[in-house]
Amino acid sequence: MAKDIKFAENARRSLLKGVDKLADTVKTTIGPKGRNVVLEQSYGNPDITNDGVTIAKSIELKDHYENMGAKLVAEAAQKTNDIAGDGTTTATVLTQAIAREGMKNVTAGANPVGIRRGIEKATKAAVDELHKISHKVESKEQIANVAAVSSASKEVGELIADAMEKVGHDGVITIEDSRGINTELSVVEGMQFDRGYLSQYMVTDNDKMEADLDNPYILITDKKISNIQDILPLLQEIVQQGKSLLIIADDVTGEALPTLVLNKIRGTFNVVAVKAPGFGDRRKAQLEDIAALTGGTVITDDLGFELKDTKIDQLGQARRVTVTKDSTTIVDGAGSKDAIKEREDSIRKQIEESTSDFDKKKLQERLAKLTGGVAVIHVGAATETELKERRYRIEDALNSTRAAVDEGYVAGGGTALVDVEKAIKDLKGETSDEQTGINIVLRALSAPVRQIAENAGKDGAVVLNKLESQENEIGYNAATDKWENMVEAGIIDPTKVTRTALQNAASIAALLLTTEAVVADIPEDKPEAPQAGAAGAPGMGM
């Protein structure tokens, strides 16, 4: 396909148009009084959401050059979401602010490479200052506040705090749809291990790139499956029952993997294959743990079992299994309480007898997985559209809370970024262009608070002017229209979310500024379809 190329000013201006179109859509959602965005779906009802990354991913612009600019901003949002789990709208607002100001200066003749150095220098100083003013999460109330701010719901904040209290900060918390209209919490027996699907074609939810299996059978083996004939009789029996299957094996290779994938794509049955967790003897022990939890049997040579002779009653079962690219979560296994308790007692005895700190640590990890359970948040709503929107909010809140536990929290509502701006305002660059880059970041740090104020119906410049004269952590609470200490009021953001949003925004914006050429496809003109009944047109029988 032929290509079209734009250079210098024309290239950057086209990219910036795309940046603005995406950012102007996303930034309307920031803050407690942010608006919703309605997304058209290829089928079914439209989605209503205020989730930044969901909106960013859904935007596809007609102009190729503008679309590239939009996709770069979407990447900043996506990377922030991947690392911190929230802060996507903040990342988008910061990217637009840095890119806009930078483009003005490059157009006026500044050197983009010097500006980039200044942006990087100011970003590093800002991140260092964020860590200095960060607070550690020490109470259930603080966890509830972080989650409440992210989800704009006090009830959700308390629900997530309860979940973390029950399964621990590192515990497994999953989110499921409820059959009723109430959102509730339950704790069930479950386990998570660090192994993801062997093929992305096994996913059942393309938006979240995860596979969800309801009431599946679970084949547990330490063998490598390369010949599909070894498990064919078992598969046929599972298909007849209309059940799904999770395969936990040493590996699935050869003809076996593509055959399973093909049957999944054709809709013959739902199957996901993952590698067994751990290595060597620890792998065997972990497989035995999974077998106890799910009521299955480990198919291994040690017990004289062959794959081709495996029967349905040797498979484990669970109410639900969720597999991502990195992890597998088994919820509510069908194992008997006696078998699980016996396994727990055995591990406790090994911990007492072990003389190795490393072995003790690994045994304690196994025990925690068996005893900790899985907290399940059942999300309820009156309609399907409301359910999706509520689920997005709860997922963001859960990710925010985990981020706060990791790196602490800072004053929310954009206040921390303005506090950082005040602390590093005297930062100096080695050249005038580098100083320009530093000044661009300093101005951009106030963009989130300006937008939050504007979404609340206030003049962003007036709010910012007053905020810059306040002491640290005193900010504008858009939810109550009051000026107060944001930390004491419970308006807090995870440091990790704020840090990641700034770093990704600076990185993408700097790339935009240093772009000198953009290459895009030239759309080909499609030939007009021949009119019906035209002379010489072949008939259907040919």
From Swiss-Prot:
It holds the Pfam family Cpn60_TCP1. It is an enzyme of class 5 (isomerase). Gene3D superfamilies: GroEL, GroEL-like equatorial domain, TCP-1-like chaperonin intermediate domain. ATP binds at residues 29-32, 86-90, 413, 477-479, 493. It comes from the Bacteria. One of its GO terms (biological process) is protein refolding. It catalyses: ATP + H2O + a folded polypeptide = ADP + phosphate + an unfolded polypeptide. One of its GO terms (cellular component) is cytoplasm. Its EC number is 5.6.1.7. It is found in: Cytoplasm. One of its GO terms (molecular function) is ATP-dependent protein folding chaperone. Its main location: cytoplasm. InterPro entries: Chaperonin_Cpn60_CS, Cpn60/GroEL, Cpn60/GroEL/TCP-1, GroEL-like_apical_dom_sf, GROEL-like_equatorial_sf, TCP-1-like_intermed_sf. Keywords: ATP-binding, Chaperone, Cytoplasm, Isomerase, Nucleotide-binding. Belongs to the chaperonin (HSP60) family. Together with its co-chaperonin GroES, plays an essential role in assisting protein folding. The GroEL-GroES system forms a nano-cage that allows encapsulation of the non-native substrate proteins and provides a physical environment optimized to promote and accelerate protein folding. Forms a cylinder of 14 subunits composed of two heptameric rings stacked back-to-back. Interacts with the co-chaperonin GroES. This is Chaperonin GroEL. It comes from Lactobacillus acidophilus (strain ATCC 700396 / NCK56 / N2 / NCFM).
